[in-house]
């Protein structure tokens, strides 16, 4: 399932006033997103739980994967498909133990050793980045770039979600460099039309995957 992903949309309710997690997820799912990750560092748990349950219902009806960023308690309470943890969050082994074997565990990585450790400790997929410059999330790391993504792809067998500064102009080369799928925040969530932006990304990723299977080197020339 995870190795067939095309597009993860990470919800951020702070980017556009009045556009909450549910509205973002509904629009993205209608246009082909096959993973939604709910990311919220500020809202109270009661509000988040109501929105997470609504997003999970939307994902289930669409056959998409629902992941909660950081908050294991919220993931379990909302019956999410899994949780995504960062390098400074709950350790991978502890997250896996609490999450159980039947749910998905994703781990943010920025270096080869982190990716290898995440795989060894039981992650189901890794996030890798930031690929390029981004103003959405400050990881403390400089952009990793395509060459490091190729290195990570050669080092681990897990699905890789590439994140950070990914746009329609560079997503094809990101897939060609070894990413399973992009994880996109601002290029979709802050777009004038979330569904249209999602559809454009989905089409571009499908193009990259098809070209890769045919042995061609996918490049996008805008």
Task: Describe every region a protein language model picked out.
Residues 130, 178:
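Short, small-residue-rich loop/turn micro-motifs
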Residues 137-138:
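Glycine/threonine-rich flexible loop motifs
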Residues 128, 161-166, 182-186:
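Glycine-rich beta-strand-to-loop/alpha-helix junction loops that act as flexible
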Residues 13, 132-134:
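A short, flexible beta-alpha/helix-coil linker loop
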Residues 1-89, 97-125, 141-144, 151-158, ...:
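Conserved N-terminal beta1-alpha1 strand-loop-helix module at the mouth
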Residues 37-41, 134, 183:
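A short, mixed-charge helix-start or loop-turn motif at secondary-structure junctions
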